[in-house]
Amino acid sequence: MNIFRLAGDMTHLASVLVLLLKIHTIKSCAGVSLKTQELYAIVFATRYLDIFTSFVSLYNTSMKLVFLGSSFSIVWYMKYHKAVHRTYDREQDTFRHWFLVLPCFLLALLIHEKFTFLEVLWTSSLYLEAVAILPQLVLLQRTRNIDNLTGQYIFLLGGYRGLYILNWIYRYFTEPHFVHWITWIAGFVQTLLYADFFYYYFLSWKNNKKLQLPA
């Protein structure tokens, strides 16, 4: 494992911890899209089915369990914890996220590396993760005002994807035959979706102002 992969994993983990801190400690999910969190739960559930069939390392298995457990716990908190659920902005979080799931699965049936059950589900998780942030970004544009923890959560999510791209570049030049076009394209699309948010995030940091997105 290279430093970019490790940094990407730790940044991804940090994003989850920031969100859990907000939900568990402050008892608030204001500004957080339940639709995006449900999509992430599907992403990890379909991607990590191989946890029952293959073992790579203790680190690998531990990270899979952490992301599976955290994604479903976040969804549970937002839907069923009374104090947290009261802060959920249902009226603004109206993106029809389920319409993203089937197209991603159908695309995985058509474009994949190997036509096996686990491989198709794994590929569909790549496509779905690339667009899972869309409901969250739409919600932020509607509400405009973004609290610090929500902003940090999304910034860390985008940072994790950026570090993974550096990981792929590093492995391309250091490992023979390391070519995974599906993973690369999905990751690049996902990173592009964060570009607008990053622009306004750095502007707010530079000017020492509260983060706001244009309507």
Curated annotation (Swiss-Prot):
Keywords tagged on the record: Endoplasmic reticulum, ER-Golgi transport, Golgi apparatus, Membrane, Protein transport, Receptor, Transmembrane, Transmembrane helix, Transport
Identify the InterPro entries for this entry. Answer: ER_ret_rcpt
Membrane topology annotation: Multi-pass membrane protein
**UniProt keyword Iron, yes or no:** no
Could you state one GO cellular component term attached to this entry?
Golgi membrane
Q: Does the keyword Membrane apply?
A: yes
Report the superkingdom from the record.
Eukaryota
Q: What is its main location?
A: Golgi
According to the record, the segments passing through the membrane are 6-26, 55-77, 98-118, 120-140, 149-169, 178-198
Q: What are the GO MF terms of this UniProt record?
A: ER retention sequence binding
* Location of the protein in the cell: Golgi apparatus membrane; Endoplasmic reticulum membrane
Q: Which GO terms describe its biological process?
A: protein retention in ER lumen; protein transport; vesicle-mediated transport
Q: What role does this protein play?
A: Determines the specificity of the luminal endoplasmic reticulum protein retention system. Required for the retro-transport of calreticulin-3 (CRT3) from the Golgi to the ER. Specifically required for elongation factor Tu receptor (EFR) function in response to the pathogen-associated molecular pattern (PAMP) elf18.
Similarity comment text for this entry: Belongs to the ERD2 family.
State the PANTHER family in the record.
ER LUMEN PROTEIN RETAINING RECEPTOR
Name used for this protein in its record: ER lumen protein-retaining receptor B
- Please state the gene responsible for encoding this protein: ERD2B
